[in-house]
């Protein structure tokens, strides 16, 4: 809002701080006070500041009075006027007639209901205009901006605009920024922006727009940022963005998009940021860009219903968000060619395991988020190529132990989250325990890394127990035997854990004869005898 408002803000902040620090020197407070005094003297000397307004410079006027219902008269020297939180309800044809010199005019959080189509007729020098925060303003007349050929910035946010008439923006050939965020627009006339060849930023987010086509964005040859988030868009075609080839950012979050056709973004060769968060996508493939390599750097697919992915041609990606989907498995080559990727978010999915080489091409990765999946184990070589990793989140999974060497590949010591897993605090956890004790300062919420088993250590934090308490109680494997027959020879192999002496009883039976039992003493357990008989294993003690 200008340097004089910055001074006012700093002075007010400083005063509040002084009240809480009784013994703090007041040198800075006095200096700011002197500065304000000089500015106020300038204001008094000017003598032209409207009643209940602030004029800290001769060029700027700020009026914020809830009782103000008409526009104040300002000096011909004033270039910027800001009207805030007033009761101003109407702008008439003569309201601004005496201020043709204005270059900046802002109406913020007022009670505007209607603006006469000639209200701005005399403001031919206007470069920036904002009319925002007027919940009763639901329309603009055709011709409202007919004389604003020099306007570069128009903000119409947080009103109740229901529709925009065709031709309303036609005179604004120098416009660079147009915002109509948080209105109730449901339909955009074709060719609405046809004369806005200089427009770089268009914000239509938080409306009720259901459809956008190639004709919607006709004429926007210079558009770089397009925001369509929080609307009701369900369908996009390859024709939709054919007139916006210079786009670098496209925001489509929180719509109802369930499917993206191949080539839908093929015209957007310069796109670096694509936000599709909170839609209904079940699959996403790089074919949406026509299968060609792209310059895309940030892709946000959080909060969809994804079960299938293909990202091979997105080799320029640096930030990939896949959290809060329905991914249960990933192919080993999913991230192939993503050598520039720095941040990968796979949290809040249904992953139970990860292929050993899934991250092998992620040589630049700095952050991997696997929080809140159902991972039960991780291969010891899973992160062997991620030597630059700075953050690794493994919290809230189903991990009971970590394999030896899992964290040994990192050059840096990454910040790690391990809490929320059912750690089995036995000898298999020696590696994690030792690593944790040596890197405690790099483990976030380490006091929540707790044992689930055995019962004697349940809910004990891993940092509170010693290595000697991580004991394995050996459980004998079930008795097992195998039988092989080759060329009339029967071989029986048994693995039995019992104390000596041990006698094995084997029952042999020849054809048409009664079974015969043979005893094999423990001293002969590793000796195999063969007989040219038809044999069956009759009993084993």
Segments (PLM) and residue ranges:
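Extracellular leucine-rich repeat
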Residues: 2-4, 8-14, 18-541
């Amino acid at each position: 809002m200008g340097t004089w408002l910055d001074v006012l803000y700093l002075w007010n902040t400083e005063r509040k701080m002084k009240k809480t620090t009784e013994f703090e020197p007041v040198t800075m407070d006095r200096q700011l006070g002197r500065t304000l005094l000089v500015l106020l003297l300038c204001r008094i000397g000017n003598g032209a500041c409207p009643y209940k307004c602030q004029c800290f410079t001769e060029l700027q006027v700020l009026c914020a009075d809830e009782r103000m219902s008409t526009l104040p008269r300002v000096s011909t020297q004033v270039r910027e006027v800001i009207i805030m939180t007033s009761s101003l309800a109407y702008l008439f044809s003569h309201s601004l007639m005496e201020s043709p010199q204005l270059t900046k005019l802002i109406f913020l959080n007022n009670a505007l209901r209607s603006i006469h189509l000639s209200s701005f007729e005399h403001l031919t020098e206007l470069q920036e205009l904002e009319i925002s925060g007027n919940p009763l303003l639901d329309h603009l007349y055709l011709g409202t901006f007919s004389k604003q050929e020099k306007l570069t910035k128009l903000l119409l946010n947080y009103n109740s605009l229901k529709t925009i008439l065709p031709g309303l923006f036609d005179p604004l050939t120098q416009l660079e920024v147009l915002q109509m965020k948080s209105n109730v627009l449901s339909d955009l006339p074709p060719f609405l922006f046809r004369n806005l060849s200089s427009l770089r930023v268009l914000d239509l987010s938080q409306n009720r727009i259901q459809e956008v086509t190639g004709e919607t964005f006709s004429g926007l040859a210079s558009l770089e940022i397009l925001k369509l988030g929080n609307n009701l868009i369900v369908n996009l075609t390859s024709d939709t963005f054919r007139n916006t080839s210079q786009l670098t950012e496209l925001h489509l979050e929180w719509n109802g998009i369930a499917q993206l056709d191949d080539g839908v973004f093929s015209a957007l060769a310069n796109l670096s940021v694509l936000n599709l968060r909170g839609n209904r996508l079940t699959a996403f493939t790089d074919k949406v860009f026509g299968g060609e390599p792209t310059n895309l750097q940030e892709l946000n697919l959080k909060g969809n219903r994804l079960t299938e992915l293909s990202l091979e041609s997105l080799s320029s990606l640096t930030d990939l968000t896949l959290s809060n989907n329905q991914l249960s498995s990933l192919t080993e080559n999913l991230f192939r060619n993503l050598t520039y990727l720095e941040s990968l978010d796979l949290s809040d999915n249904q992953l139970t395991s990860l292929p050993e080489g899934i991250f092998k091409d992620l040589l630049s990765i700095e952050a991997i988020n696997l929080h809140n999946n159902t991972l039960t184990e991780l291969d010891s070589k899973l992160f062997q190529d991620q030597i630059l990793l700075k953050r690794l989140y493994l919290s809230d999974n189903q991990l009971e132990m970590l394999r030896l060497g899992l964290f040994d590949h990192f050059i840096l010591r990454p910040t790690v989250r391990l809490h929320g897993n059912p750690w089995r605090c036995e000898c298999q956890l020696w590696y994690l325990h030792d690593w944790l004790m040596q890197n405690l300062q790099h483990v976030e919420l380490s006091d929540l890394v707790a044992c689930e088993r055995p019962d004697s250590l349940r809910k004990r934090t891993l940092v509170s127990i010693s290595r000697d308490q991580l004991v394995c109680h050996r459980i004998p494997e079930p008795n097992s035997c195998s039988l092989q027959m080759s060329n009339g020879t029967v071989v029986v192999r048994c693995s039995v854990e019992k104390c000596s002496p041990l006698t094995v009883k084997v029952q042999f039976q020849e054809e048409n004869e009664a079974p015969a039992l043979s005893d094999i003493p423990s001293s002969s357990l590793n000796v195999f005898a063969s007989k040219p008989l038809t044999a069956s294993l009759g009993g084993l003690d």
